[in-house]
């Protein structure tokens, strides 16, 4: 599986993942809306929105 792997302020990259899922999570803080993409489907704290998916590059 290929997932986007990126922090908000970084250029987008892709990564081959063994977890079988990709995620995209977003939240707001004093800097504005922050997003993060990667492999797997982590548990998140309240106030953080997460979307998990199971196809190549689905977390664009």
Curated annotation (Swiss-Prot):
GO CC entries: extracellular region
UniProt KW Disulfide bond keyword: yes
InterPro entries to which the protein is assigned, alphabetical: Snake_3FTx, Snake_toxin-like_sf, Snake_toxin_con_site, Toxin_cobra-type
GO molecular function terms noted in the UniProt entry: acetylcholine receptor inhibitor activity; ion channel regulator activity; toxin activity
Cross-referenced SUPFAM superfamilies: Snake toxin-like
Subcellular location: Secreted
Tissue and organ expression note: Expressed by the venom gland.
Keyword line: Acetylcholine receptor inhibiting toxin, Disulfide bond, Ion channel impairing toxin, Neurotoxin, Postsynaptic neurotoxin, Secreted, Toxin
Protein purpose: Binds to muscle nicotinic acetylcholine receptor (nAChR) and inhibit acetylcholine from binding to the receptor, thereby impairing neuromuscular transmission.
Similarity comment text for this entry: Belongs to the three-finger toxin family. Short-chain subfamily. Type I alpha-neurotoxin sub-subfamily.
Protein name as annotated: Three-finger toxin Mnn I
Organism: Micrurus nigrocinctus
């Amino acid at each position: 599986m290929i997932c986007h792997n990126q922090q908000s302020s970084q250029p987008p990259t892709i990564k081959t993942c063994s977890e079988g899922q990709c995620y995209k999570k977003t939240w707001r803080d004093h800097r504005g809306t922050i997003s993060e993409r990667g492999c797997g489907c982590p548990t998140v704290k309240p106030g953080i929105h997460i979307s998990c998916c199971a196809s190549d590059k689905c977390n664009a």
